[in-house]
């Protein structure tokens, strides 16, 4: 068992640890991995699979609802929406009230990170220096603690890995929405 808290980010897949949720990133770390894949043509129309390849979520920008991207569970029930206006608006059912995307992922003064407020707690999405397309999520006051989540682009796919602490804090849906916003190619400010 590794004592390096960052070693799990590069490890293989593990077994299922939360029943209906996908398997973890590694058996010992408990990390949960989701893969945004099957882009049609991009992250605004894609499938989000667990590490076992099973679809868990769907992201769709349907022509019948122009200007909207909807995030759905595997059973088809929507849980999140992005309304693409000049200043995009987001909402996550029962957890994030309707607000501007620029409020949900607030750009820092130095423009090096984005603050995400969820359940009255503040988190920071921080791009990693010298690591192209890797963004870590930390609690705002955490300093050097291991990241709660990581977004990494790998080829055409986008990987989202969450720690057990992130899952327990209810960050799965806000993190899924963050991936779509950050990789949409659209201005969110």
Predicted stretch roles:
Residues 39-126:
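Acidic, polar low-complexity intrinsically disordered regions
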């Amino acid at each position: 068992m590794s004592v390096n808290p960052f070693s799990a980010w590069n490890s293989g897949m593990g077994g299922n640890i939360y029943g209906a949720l996908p398997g973890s990133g590694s058996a010992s770390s408990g990390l949960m991995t989701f893969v945004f894949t099957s882009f049609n043509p991009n992250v605004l129309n894609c499938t989000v699979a667990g590490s076992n390849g099973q679809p868990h979520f769907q992201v769709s920008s349907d022509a019948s609802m122009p200007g909207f991207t909807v995030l759905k569970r595997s059973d088809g029930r929507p849980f999140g929406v992005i309304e693409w206006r000049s200043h995009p608006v987001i909402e996550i059912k029962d957890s994030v009230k309707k607000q501007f995307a620029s409020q949900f992922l607030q750009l820092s003064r130095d423009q090096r990170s984005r603050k995400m407020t969820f359940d009255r707690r503040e988190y920071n999405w921080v791009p990693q220096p010298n690591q192209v397309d890797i963004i870590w999520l930390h609690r705002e006051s955490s300093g050097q603690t291991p990241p709660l989540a990581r977004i990494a682009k790998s080829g055409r796919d986008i990987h989202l890995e969450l720690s057990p602490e992130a899952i327990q804090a209810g960050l799965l849906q806000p993190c899924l929405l963050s991936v779509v916003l950050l990789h949409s190619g659209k201005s969110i400010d």
